[in-house]
Every structure is written in structure tokens, then in C-alpha cells.
């Protein structure tokens, strides 16, 4: 799945989804050659055309 990061508009590939301790989703992305979990509230999903 791909999603757009709202603050920068950059598109990232989502590799995993997990919930934090409060139950909110976080996306695992690769940013600057590092794996980072970021809150899903900062992303807008992109519908892939088939």
C-alpha cells in the first residue's frame, strides 16, 4: 500500500501496520534508509489503479 505523508506531500510505501498502546494505528515506512513507525494520522492513503 502507498500513502502520502501530509506534512511534506511525499509518497511512501507502507510495509506494516501496528497499533500503539492506545490502539491508534502506526505505519512502518522506510525514510532516509531507516525503518520508522509513524502515526497513521499523518498519512492519506492512495488508491492504486489496476
Predicted regions mapped to residue ranges:
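Short acidic DE-rich linear segments
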Residues: 47-50
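Basic/aromatic-rich interaction segments and small domains that mediate binding to polyanionic partners
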Residues: 1-42
Amino acid at each position: 500500500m502507498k500513502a502520502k505523508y501530509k506534512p511534506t506531500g511525499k509518497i511512501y510505501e507502507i510495509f506494516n501496520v501496528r497499533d500503539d498502546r492506545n490502539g491508534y494505528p502506526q505505519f512502518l515506512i522506510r525514510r532516509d534508509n531507516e525503518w520508522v513507525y509513524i502515526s497513521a494520522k499523518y498519512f492519506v492513503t492512495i488508491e492504486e489503479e489496476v
